[in-house]
């Protein structure tokens, strides 16, 4: 909906509202996920300690249970992560209530309210507020275990000046299943609302300025500030298994509310009269991504709080020492330039251009080492912005 506030075409208010559903494709519960072949266990993991140091697992890998063959020259292998592996038994069962009917697919609502104002002829500013919220989350409940079958424990972060607050803080919200129930899997997938409230909200404010000045000059620039807040603490209270990630690490952070992050973007383009040469450039300043401090805590250390070794003979528990959004990478600033000339020959038209990427030769860091070791290489750069380079191009129309 758009409304001309004063009827002079200079001030408008625009409101948009939409609901978007998760695609009903092959990767959803309406597709391959409910295929019987997708519901049985076709892969598992298990721990292995190379006791004899010959770089091969000297265990009976066909035996799904834990083995300690170190006294006979073999190795130590933990129990497989899913005892249903290679059996004609479903590990995943879907709630019939989410497979039939309407209004059940995961969705997100999106609302935007914008005000556009003409400041001068061919110069306008647009200010908008945007909110996006998600719903119909799915939860996985392992019916083979209860919440009381998980034992909570804590981990004390190492003291390190690179960590928020210098480290030394106690991280709670960690769980380990009763060892006698490890590997027993009977997952029931249903709506998360059956266990409690789960939320995910995005809020942002954007300001954009557009100027189309005479004689071929165009200027555009703007800023956007926003953040995503998520909370599934009520779900974790009922389903401690929700703290385990797909990679096997632990995620104790059920409420994540990072700071608002701001980015800036702009462009300018100008066509030089008579010589018909176009000069343009783009600039962007983007906040660095969220970083983790992934620490592998030995089972002996965990046992000090847990009261026993980790289930499944796991040698360590992996978790991030920092709350998502509390540690960010360096801001990435980049300037790109382009010069283009149009040549005309009879009925042919040739566009010759030179592009200069990363004109300021910024070495902004793009990825970091996120494995934490005290006095180690945590946050060492692993990838930086590509160095400044030029590209020559030509396009012929005839």
Language-model segments: residues:
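Gram-negative outer-membrane beta-barrel transporters
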Residues: 128-290
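Hydrophobic, lipid-facing positions within transmembrane beta-strands of outer-membrane proteins
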Residues: 1, 109-113, 203-207, 262-268, ...
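C-terminal beta-signal and adjacent terminal beta-strands/loops
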Residues: 23, 122, 135-136, 140-143, ...
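Short sequence motifs at beta-strands and strand-loop junctions characteristic
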Residues: 101-107, 188, 196-201, 256-261, ...
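Membrane-spanning beta-strand positions in outer-membrane beta-barrel proteins
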Residues: 2, 10-12, 112, 124-128, ...
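Residue-level signature of outer-membrane beta-barrel architecture
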Residues: 1-5, 19, 117, 211, ...
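Membrane-embedded beta-strand positions of outer-membrane beta-barrel proteins
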Residues: 13-15, 115, 127, 209, ...
